[in-house]
Amino acid sequence: CEELDGVAGVVTDPDELRGLAVLESDELCDLFPGETVVWPPGRDEGDGPAWMVRRSSVMPDDESDDRSAWSISRRVLLADHNAAVAARAGTLADGIGIEPKPAAALSEAGAWHDVGKNDARFQRLLWRGDPAGRKALAKSGGRSTPLGAVRRARADAGLPTGWRHELASAAAYWEQAESDGVGQEFRDLVTRLVGTSHGHGRPLFDHDPVTAGPDHADALEELVGEGEWESLIARTDRQWGPWGTAYLEALLRAADCTISMEGK
């Protein structure tokens, strides 16, 4: 049956579904590398889903049907990953013919989108131990870790429930851009692209500065403590239009996903 092409698995166990339903999209990507997760259409977020389908991102008749190329089996350095995403974002922008200013913002956002992973707790999670003296990672390798083990490892590393590395990344850029005297229009757009790179933050982040920290505390206080994040979302919507910002966000996400799928 053509409708079953690429189906990697179906989950119907209520307990397992409840555990999976609370995960963020990037956590599901880590749990099921090379696969797309499909939930029941129109499901109520307040109710547990009835099923979940795991569909292979690479269809069996795809020319690139090499599953090993779609999963991470080795560690990826943070600096290398950010550089690769920045370059890919620039390539996409150039190929589409985007104007120079938003194209430059896309590349800059790619270079900063995962900087928040420098958080010592997150590095402890990725290294599965003390990261002291080691280069920062973007990907830990060995992504077949069971769901329960992933959640325990996050807690053991000291990460608060719901902590978002992309908000820390946005704060890091906001802080540096202010120091460098970057113009507000460009600074706003890059910060927005970085902060929304996993689909959150439109228009709010469910964080207070303490939970979002501890790094870049002043920037986080300004962004989520004083409401500057909501203001820059409104400013970028006015400047670039809601569809324009959504388009740029999608391009950055495409750059990140394709690089990750290539194991970079």
Where are these regions (language model features)?
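Divalent metal-dependent catalytic cores for phosphoryl transfer on phosphate-bearing substrates
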Residues: 69, 75, 97-264
